[in-house]
A protein has these predicted regions:
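N-terminal intrinsically disordered, low-complexity segments enriched in P/E/S/T
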Residues: 1-337
Length: 337
């Protein structure tokens, strides 16, 4: 009989070694909280979090098993940490950063995905933190949450607060992206990890009887734009199609994302954790009309457009939408490795 050992199998053993070392260093007055940063960064390697800059503090309240937890964490934002690691490597494609994501992995193999668009200061600007200490004493050699953990201010439940953090891997959608002739698109497909793939049109969205309205201000080419959009929430649309996750995997949906593609092949990825009501609860919208007249007959943005309220710039506002593909981003990463 042959046995195959994977890195995932070794994680608990490697992490025990790191924790023991951290205890020894702590006794000597040196704080040790190593995290592997891998994938598409300029300088991959193991980084000791207390040595990274700038140092940031976040006070948060979130639900853990339904119970409110409040704590104050110290660490470096995920965006700054990736820059410490040489920055995310990108191509010359327009807003290529929006096709990339980070997989955070704990010592037990638990994972959560973060889109780069969520944390990039030019877009979502969410202060997701990679923390190495806290006022409650849950982090450190003797803490129950390990040497490091993800902290996601604003999330309702703590599913994306990956504890016993061992690695952060930057991945990208397969290159090159799907080509497209551009132009006005009358509809989009919803496909991938859903039970009921479908064609999405303004008529099918209206028929759901779950339309909502969002007023958003964002930068387009450096110019502020304000518009009011009507559509159906992206989360509602995916749920209506039947998201296919594995109930045996804890918070499996946090490893999933949706890829929005325009008629010209332009793409942006959004993690499901960002929009799930129990977690990020961001009101991203698949819009079919707007007060500015850019959607619908005669509009330059086509029949459908992805709207991401709160983003500083409109890079994730994919217009002339032709595809919404739900993917297991962690599985896609294994295929590309």
């Amino acid at each position: 009989m042959t046995y195959q050992t994977t890195i995932k199998d070794l994680l608990p053993y490697l992490y025990n070694i790191e924790t023991n070392l951290a205890g020894i260093f702590d006794d000597c007055g040196y704080q040790f909280a190593p995290v592997l940063i891998a994938g598409q960064v300029g300088d991959p390697g193991i980084y000791n979090l207390p040595s990274t800059t700038p140092v940031t503090t976040e006070s948060v309240t979130y639900l853990a098993a339904g119970v409110p937890v409040s704590d104050t964490y110290t660490g470096t934002t995920l965006w700054d940490l990736l820059n410490d690691a040489g920055g995310v490597t990108t191509t010359t494609a327009k807003n290529d950063i929006l096709s990339k994501y980070v997989i955070a992995t704990g010592s037990d193999g638990y994972q959560a995905v973060f889109s780069l668009g969520e944390i990039d200061p030019s877009f979502g600007n969410q202060p997701v933190l990679v923390a190495y200490s806290d006022t409650a004493g849950q982090l450190g050699p003797n803490g129950s949450d390990g040497l490091a953990r993800m902290v996601v201010p604003g999330d309702i439940a703590g599913g994306r607060y990956v504890s016993d953090l061992v690695s952060l891997k930057v991945e990208s959608l397969p290159e090159p992206g799907p080509g497209g002739a551009g132009g006005i698109s009358p509809q989009a497909t919803l496909s991938g990890a859903v039970a009921d793939p479908t064609i999405v049109t303004p008529e099918t969205l209206i028929a759901l009887n779950q339309s909502t309205t969002e007023t958003a201000t964002y930068l387009a080419g450096g110019t502020p734009v304000t518009d009011t959009y009507t559509g159906v929430s992206l989360w509602t649309l995916i749920q209506d199609a039947g998201l296919l996750t594995d109930p045996a995997i804890k918070n499996d949906l946090l490893g999933f994302a949706v890829v929005a593609t325009g008629s010209d092949g332009y793409r942006a990825i959004i993690s499901l954790g960002e929009i799930a009501p129990n977690f990020g609860d961001q009101p991203d919208l698949v819009a079919y009309s707007d007060t500015g007249g850019q959607l619908g007959p005669g509009g330059a943005d086509g029949a459908l457009r992805l709207i991401v309220p709160g983003d500083a710039a409109g890079g994730r506002y994919v217009s002339n939408l032709v595809s919404l593909q739900v993917i297991d981003a962690t599985a896609a990463a294994h295929l590309s490795s």
